Amino acid sequence: MNQKLSEQELIRRQKIEKLQKLGVEVFHETVKFDLNINKIIQKYNSFSKDELAKDEFSLSTTGRIITIRSSFLVLKSQGSKFQIYLPIKELDKKYLELIDLLDIGDIIFVNGKLMKTQTGELTLRANELKLLSKSLKVLPDKFHGLNDIEERYRHRYVDLIVNDDVRKTFLLRSRIISLIRKYFDNLEYLEVDTPVLQPILGGASAKPFITKFNALNSNFYLRIATELPLKKLVVGGFDRVYEIGRIFRNEGVDTTHNPEFTSIEYYEAYSNNEGMMNRTEDLFKFIAKELNLKTIFFNGYEIDLNKPFRRLNMVEALNEKLGIDLYKISFEDAKVLAKKHHIKVESYFKIGHIINELFELFIEKDLIQPTFVYGHPIEISPLANKNKKNPNFTDRAELFIGTKEYANMFTELTDPIDQLERFKDQQNEKDNGNEEANEIDYDFVEALEYGLPPTGGCGIGIDRLVMLFTNNESIREVLLFPHLKNK
């Protein structure tokens, strides 16, 4: 790689040579220190100036230099800032030589005594300094140097150094995932890991990534869902299971979609769609309570998570909106209706597909407050149980908040004969051009033949969930390293 260095970058490399001539180790292997900056502030910030002077608290710490001015440095570590005072007349010559060669971005070790300045700022009066890692790049200015969104994503490590709000987002993401685990662990769910590489495509409607498994001389898919192996575990006697893991869908990128994302799927024996709606609502409210959030501001909307989540039947909502009865519509009339509203009817479409397209066109945009939409057509729900009152529809629901879908749940289909027929229908769709349709998974059908107890299941996209609770409108803002086009 031919790297053209800026003037500042050249100067910093020249400083390395000067430091080495002074016998300074430029890149240390490790160092021991007393307290990190956060702990120092927590422990000593309440002390008065006189208390610190009287007791002479000596300690060492480390951090990245973010400010150099006169006789002061400001260090940053783990999101906190801490001032260092350099008593130039008292410091040993070797430390003065080191100070002259320090730059913003360098990581250093400092030992000294705690004090407070005239303005009351907790400060470490240095008596020893050590360079731990020399920064050869110039950090961008927080307000003017890192405004390009693509550059922020491409150099996320720099983004994290200079933008505190970005750091807070990812700390909160980690906390949300921990809360999800806490919620399900407290309910005695078992966390499991299932294979990322799958020989059969299934568990969701999505285009896959395909890879070659050399040892088996076969093509495998990167999983598009964890549903089928998790339900096999319920067959095997684990009544409550969940998995948090990476999912891969070879599809487009937009503000709410990334080809690689994190999801949680959870399954509970002797539950159903109603039970999953209740469980999912309780999970969202649990997270909000733990984060001390009563309302959420997202995508320009104020979301109230305290109230009971609304329940809305998909077809009944459309019937009211369009003034027709979609329960009784013929396929020919459905195609005419689709054409009227500029919906492309694919070769594999049936009435259920058109109903779903109409829902996405007319209803989704109005689903602001938390709403469970239920009663999905069987054609788009190959793994969900048929509704007893109308077998053309299923006991399935999706949770919408702020016009976005966050969770998909249903009463699981436990009948292996029906499941095989549904898989065959999916395969027929695939043969007729639906790249997102499932393949026939005979191994899963065999698992059902051993007996799957009545089961409810749900999947949630964790990245979207984090977007909701951090008020970020782009999924890239909640992914540490989002996928980007090559420069």
From Swiss-Prot:
Cofactor note: Binds 3 Mg(2+) ions per subunit.
Cofactor(s) in the UniProt record: Mg(2+)
Organism superkingdom: Bacteria
Binding positions for Mg(2+) 2 per the UniProt entry: 405
SUPFAM superfamilies, A to Z: Class II aaRS and biotin synthetases (SSF55681), Nucleic acid-binding proteins (SSF50249)
EC number: 6.1.1.6
Reaction catalysis annotation: tRNA(Lys) + L-lysine + ATP = L-lysyl-tRNA(Lys) + AMP + diphosphate
GO cellular component, one term: cytosol
GO-annotated molecular function: ATP binding; lysine-tRNA ligase activity; magnesium ion binding; tRNA binding
Top-level EC class: ligase
Keywords noted in UniProt: Aminoacyl-tRNA synthetase, ATP-binding, Cytoplasm, Ligase, Magnesium, Metal-binding, Nucleotide-binding, Protein biosynthesis
Biological process per Gene Ontology, one example term: lysyl-tRNA aminoacylation
Residues annotated as binding Mg(2+) 1: 398, 405
Locations listed in the record: Cytoplasm
Record's subunit section: Homodimer.
Alphabetized NCBIfam families for the sequence: lysS_bact (TIGR00499), PRK00484.1 (NF001756)
Family note: Belongs to the class-II aminoacyl-tRNA synthetase family.
Protein name as catalogued: Lysine--tRNA ligase
Classification lineage: Bacteria, Bacillati, Mycoplasmatota, Mycoplasmoidales, Metamycoplasmataceae
